[in-house]
Swiss-Prot record:
It comes from Cicer arietinum. This is Small ribosomal subunit protein uS19c. The lineage of its organism: Eukaryota, Viridiplantae, Streptophyta, Embryophyta, Tracheophyta. The keyword Chloroplast applies. GO terms for cellular component: chloroplast; mitochondrial small ribosomal subunit. InterPro entries: Ribosomal_uS19, Ribosomal_uS19_bac-type, Ribosomal_uS19_CS, Ribosomal_uS19_SF. Belongs to the universal ribosomal protein uS19 family. NCBIfam families: rpsS_bact (TIGR01050). Its main location: plastid. Keywords: Chloroplast, Plastid, Ribonucleoprotein, Ribosomal protein, RNA-binding, rRNA-binding. Protein S19 forms a complex with S13 that binds strongly to the 16S ribosomal RNA. The keyword Manganese does not apply. It is found in: Plastid, Chloroplast.
Length: 92
């Protein structure tokens, strides 16, 4: 279930301050954040945000197609290492 349209999208205050500061300066630098729950808003377009996945920060370039999604959707936390090998054939 999505968030109510009466409410504004959630964006962490510290992240919003950093983006607004870079927009006023006109600079582009990597913004490091742990806030995976923040929603991508149009003022973030064109910035590179390094999102924490539990182990490291993955740099993600924000495009216009990402608006409305959460930051955490673009930094996977689990790595698939393959299914467990079944050794029943070698035991026979």
């Amino acid at each position: 279930m999505g968030r109510s349209l009466k409410k504004n999208p959630f964006v962490a205050n510290h992240l919003l301050r950093k983006i607004n500061k870079l927009n006023t300066k006109g600079e582009k630098e990597i913004i490091i954040t742990w806030s995976r729950a923040s929603t991508i808003i149009p003022t973030m377009i064109g910035h590179t945000i390094a999102i924490h996945n539990g182990r490291e920060h993955l740099p993600i370039y924000i495009t216009d197609r990402m608006v409305g999604h959460k930051l955490g959707e673009f930094s996977p936390t689990l790595t698939f290492r393959g299914y467990a090998k079944n050794d029943t054939k070698s035991r026979r």
